[in-house]
Design a protein with these regions (language model features):
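Nucleotide-sugar donor-binding/catalytic module of glycosyltransferases
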Residues: 1-238, 242
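C-terminal subregions of glycosyltransferases and related glycan-biosynthesis enzymes
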Residues: 208-325
Length: 325
């Protein structure tokens, strides 16, 4: 008999953190779960940790594959998952014991397609409020929708959610970007959903890595990472323009004050050739942003954004040099 909930966990070189995530899944108040572990070619002790867990808890199973990236690992796990509901967890994070019970119970009561909950940042053993989500999850709202509550444009991560599996399959949802893969899929799902439940309860602890390899989001200024971030911005924006264009101004403002800001900052330590792809992608994105949204940005900052988008990185650095320390 299929489990009520399947949780897909991609694994790649997370030996210091994987036991904590697996312990948190094993301790879930919702016990009727299937945990699909996908070892994406780990070269550390992660595979051995996963195999040991599978041997001791029949709810866990392991798929092993050559390294193909997070999107491919999630998609592989989803194909094996059989639960009526679907969730994703990253192998270096922690899921509070009550999380999946609350999210699934809410969906069963409301009939919504997605349930989403609040997030905290985990540093060592300290749990911090995540400023970006403070307002978004301040109150519980059932059977809402992104087109009626545009604050959900900021709810772009996949791991603080449970999806109704029939909804996921009906729309053929899958991950396709090699990095920053959450946003296009999550925003697409938000728009396609009949309704969404938003819980003020904390359902996920997102770790800041201090051991092992840094996470993708911790490598802000590496050229390949900068380009990957901008590709996410463009792909997500294109989905919004196609399916819910009335949300694009909110999305564009959020990007300009967040991901685009970090992209432009990368001009301080990288050359024009290294950032060529990122410049092209930012240029493409700016072409979709309404002038009224651009006018809301401080003029000096907008000038730096346009220099980056034009590939004029030397001039951008000169602008940074003029700024006070």
């Amino acid at each position: 008999m299929a489990a009520k909930l399947s949780v897909v966990v991609p694994i790649y070189n997370v030996e210091p953190y994987l036991p904590g995530l697996l312990d948190s899944l094993a301790a879930q108040e919702l016990t009727d779960i299937q945990v699909v572990l996908v070892d994406d070619g780990s070269t550390d002790g992660s595979s051995a940790i996963a195999k040991a867990r599978v041997a001791e808890d029949r709810r866990f199973e392991l798929i092993s594959q050559s390294n193909q990236g997070l999107s491919a690992a999630r998609n592989a796990g989803t194909r094996v998952a059989t639960g009526r509901y679907l969730a994703f967890a990253d192998a270096d994070d922690v899921v509070p014991e009550k999380a999946y019970r609350m999210l699934v119970d809410t969906l069963e009561q409301s009939g919504s397609d997605i349930a989403s909950g609040d997030v905290r940042r985990l540093r060592s053993n300290e749990v911090e409020r995540h400023g970006g989500y403070a307002d978004l999850f301040a109150t519980t709202r059932l059977r809402t929708h992104i087109t009626r509550d545009d604050s959900l444009v900021a709810d772009r991560m996949v791991w603080n959610k449970v999806f109704r599996r029939s909804f996921w399959d009906h729309h053929g949802l899958e991950f396709f970007l090699p990095q920053y893969e959450d946003a296009p899929v999550t925003i697409h799902a938000h728009i396609l959903a009949s309704s969404v439940d938003v819980l003020s309860d904390v359902v996920y602890l997102w770790r800041f890595r201090e051991l092992g390899e840094p996470s993708i989001t911790q490598r802000h200024y590496e050229p390949a990472n900068v380009a990957a971030r901008m590709r996410m911005v463009v792909e997500t924006g294109d989905i919004i323009l196609r399916l819910a264009p009335e949300l694009h101004d909110v999305f564009a403002k959020d990007m300009l004050t967040g991901d685009v800001f970090w992209t432009v900052e990368a001009g301080k330590m990288n050359g024009a050739s290294d950032l060529a792809d990122s410049s092209d992608l930012l240029h493409r994105f700016l072409g979709t942003v309404e002038p009224a949204v651009l006018r809301q940005m401080p003029a000096p900052y907008l000038h730096r954004v346009r220099l980056f988008a034009a590939g004029r990185i030397d001039e951008l650095r000169a602008e940074f040099a003029k700024m006070p320390e």
